[in-house]
Swiss-Prot record:
This is Macrolide export protein MacA. It comes from Escherichia coli O157:H7. The gene is macA. The lineage of its organism: Bacteria, Pseudomonadati, Pseudomonadota, Gammaproteobacteria, Enterobacterales. Keywords: Antibiotic resistance, Cell inner membrane, Cell membrane, Coiled coil, Membrane, Transmembrane, Transmembrane helix, Transport. GO terms for molecular function: efflux transmembrane transporter activity. One of its GO terms (cellular component) is efflux pump complex. Residues 92-137 form a coiled coil.
Length: 371
């Protein structure tokens, strides 16, 4: 009886083992085949750029000030007006400068009259001295009288020298007064557009220490872009690199130029250090305006017709610029070592290790997802 139970128990165990084996085999045979997201390696172009935010300014901008004090009697322009070089912009009350000219001219007339009188007196003194010399030879006059005549002649000569010096000084004052009269006319130092008016008509300007600003002119035909670049990126920049930008109102239009310079003085913004890279762009249609925000791209590298793969295809690093990548062949994956070159935020150049047509694994597809 015991023997029969033992045999039956063995049959049950064997049956369980067989069933478990069959289940395992079924699972293996019906397990989903792993699928991968892949990409065929092909030649292409690769660009590496620095992204930055910038502001637009006019390449040439000048503050037009007053060099004399007085009331701004006339202001002939308004904000937005386009002016030509030497065009009259405004007039400061010229009365004070005109009165100064009249005063100096009157002083000069008086000095010239004094000089004529002094010349006549000098002529008389010379005649008197000559007469005294002849009389002294016959001892008709004393030597003291002769010395007195000589002194009188020298005094008259010195008076003429003093008057000449006063005439020169007043002539310089007259030239200054005429210049100040010219300064009452505010003219445009260059062609451009009036972008700001600081002093209104009727206001009084005082030019005692520094020239007060009347208005600001900007030449909008060429714009200057100041791109704010982080300290991590600025070390890669140099003059001559290609740069382009778009503006918020027209993101499809690219405005292109070349880096002009990188300002050496940084700016600190919320404990972050930034430098300014500048470049110029033409603005023939006047679409670009002051203080517009620019989305700037500065091109660091531009390689043509090279093999590239996505950065996501790179595996573990194995050395300087060397990585492992997975290739898919006949449904099986294998690793290969590659050497990389230029890279940007999405792709990388393959210098060595892959050929055009190779299929690289960039990820594993989820069950039920298409390759």
């Amino acid at each position: 009886m015991k023997k029969r139970k033992t045999v039956k128990k063995r049959y049950v165990i064997a049956l369980v083992i067989v069933i478990a084996g069959l289940i395992t085999l079924w699972r293996i045979l019906n397990a989903p085949v792993p699928t991968y997201q892949t990409l065929i390696v092909r030649p292409g172009d690769l660009q590496q750029s620095v992204l930055a935010t910038g502001k637009l300014d006019a390449l040439r901008k000048v503050d037009v000030g007053a060099q004399v004090s007085g009331q701004l009697k006339t202001l002939s322009v308004a904000i937005g007006d386009k002016v030509k070089k030497d065009q009259l912009l405004g007039v400061i009350d010229p009365e004070q400068a005109e009165n100064q000219i009249k005063e100096v001219e009157a002083t000069l007339m008086e000095l010239r009259a004094q000089r004529q009188q002094a010349e006549a007196e000098l002529k008389l003194a010379r005649v008197t001295y000559s007469r005294q010399q002849r009389l002294a030879q016959t001892q008709a006059v004393s030597l003291q009288d002769l010395d007195t005549a000589a002194t009188e002649m020298a005094v008259k000569q010195a008076q003429i020298g003093t008057i000449d010096a006063q005439i020169k000084r007043n002539q310089a004052s007259l030239d200054t007064a005429k210049t100040n009269l010219d300064y009452t006319r505010i003219v445009a130092p260059m062609a451009g557009e009036v972008t700001q008016i600081t002093t209104l008509q009727g206001q009084t300007v005082i030019a005692a220490q520094q020239a007060p600003n009347i208005l600001t002119l900007a030449d909008m035909s060429t714009m200057l872009v100041k791109a704010q670049v982080s300290e991590a990126d600025v070390i890669h920049l140099k003059p001559g690199q290609k740069a382009w930008f778009t503006v918020l109102g027209d993101p499809l239009t690219r405005y292109e130029g070349q880096i002009k310079d990188v300002l050496p003085t940084p700016e600190k913004v919320n404990d972050a250090i930034f430098y300014y890279a500048r470049f110029e762009v033409p603005n023939p249609n006047g679409l670009l305006r002051l203080d517009m925000t620019a989305q700037v791209h500065i091109q660091l590298t531009d390689v043509k017709n090279v093999l590239t793969i996505p950065l996501s295809a790179l595996g573990d690093p194995v050395g300087d610029n060397r990585y492992k990548v997975k290739l898919l062949r006949n449904g099986e994956t294998r690793e290969r070592e590659v050497t990389i070159g230029a890279r940007n935020d999405t792709d990388v150049e393959i210098v060595k290790g892959l050929e055009a047509g190779d299929e690289v694994v960039i990820g594993e597809a989820k069950p039920g997802a298409a390759q």
